[in-house]
Amino acid sequence: MSTKYVEAGELKEGSYVVIDGEPCRVVEIEKSKTGKHGSAKARIVAVGVFDGGKRTLSLPVDAQVEVPIIEKFTAQVLSISGDIIQLMDMRDYKTIEVPMSYVEEEAKGRLAPGAEVEVWQILDRFKIVRVK
């Protein structure tokens, strides 16, 4: 599980954060100062990368949040059987199995054995992002 920690105030829309153990893409962030003696707060709205669920996080801007390290690589589709796609990593030729639910909608129609795809590895899970 490869992650790093950053302050909540450093996050921007489009960046990634881990909320409740699920990697999410930040879609909205609001920062507000609560009062004369209060510290600034950040309200982060994010969408799950794998499940599409909307999650909200409210915390001080100087609090540490977990950010996933996304590893991107190319793989070749070996076979599609039911809802499992078997891939071969082009770096070290290992075989990877990815559920069909972890494939972007735009890429689903273009998947075929022999096609090269871009894969993201986030927190030991794989997501097919696009067909090359």
Swiss-Prot record:
| Signal peptide extent | none
**GO BP field:** positive regulation of translational elongation; positive regulation of translational termination
Family matches, as InterPro entries: IF5A-like, IF5A-like_N, NA-bd_OB-fold, Rib_uL2_dom2, Trans_elong_IF5A_hypusine_site, Transl_elong_IF5A_arc, Transl_elong_IF5A_C, Translation_prot_SH3-like_sf
Compartment(s) where it occurs, according to its Swiss-Prot or TrEMBL record:
Cytoplasm
- What Pfam families is this protein classified in? eIF-5a, IF5A-like_N
GO CC, sorted alphabetically, is: cytoplasm
Molecular function (GO) terms for this protein are: ribosome binding; RNA binding; translation elongation factor activity; translation initiation factor activity
State the function annotated in the UniProt record: Functions by promoting the formation of the first peptide bond.
What name appears for this protein in its UniProt entry? Translation initiation factor 5A
This protein's encoding gene: eIF5A
